[in-house]
């Protein structure tokens, strides 16, 4: 209708965590990023790090990582770790056309000043802002993976490496690197709304939402796979109490994944299509 692609649907993984200004968290984050690049292939990716994108496998791309990565580890409290990886042309002819990439990794880990900005200066006691890594893979790639590299195994590896506060994974939509067209001025919300009504199995979260201080207290979004850390499970009676509730459910199953209790909502999900009367199971 508007001639622009503002998101692509695919397999999405969202991880939210604290202490983004610590060396331990930065080291875990780089392991996750390395796993993503290994799974996708550096030759398919471009990197955005504070300036115009360049091909990741190019000399400029390698130089950009070699320049910034040491700072994220040597000075984690003072140096933010905020960049994007995405497939497609590093220099598309128009920012507004065909700019939602198939493969995406969005890393937003602030420095100490950014994490505590609101708590120190505007809303004392609100706590730290969250750090997050989110990523997306196209459906065709998911279906092409052999059993030993299926998306469930990849998701489990990523959660085990990152040890998040909480995480979700399943079918969803991932914004383009240029997220401005998701807002009302860019017409992205108007485009998305009917599609999200038609396909009820798609999870949709804006990246800014993942920074919410509300996530200090609870996770407000779930997906087919949800991973909940002990800090949140304690608010619900503890890991074993929650596990017992899940085991009593007809649809849910649970298992330990790293520092989290992983919760699976039924069999591998299809996508309902309301126009064809294909609703999802309750």
Locations of the language-model features?
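C-terminal interaction module
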Residues: 1-55, 176-282
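Internal, hydrophobic cores of structured domains that mediate oligomerization or house catalytic pockets
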Residues: 48-183
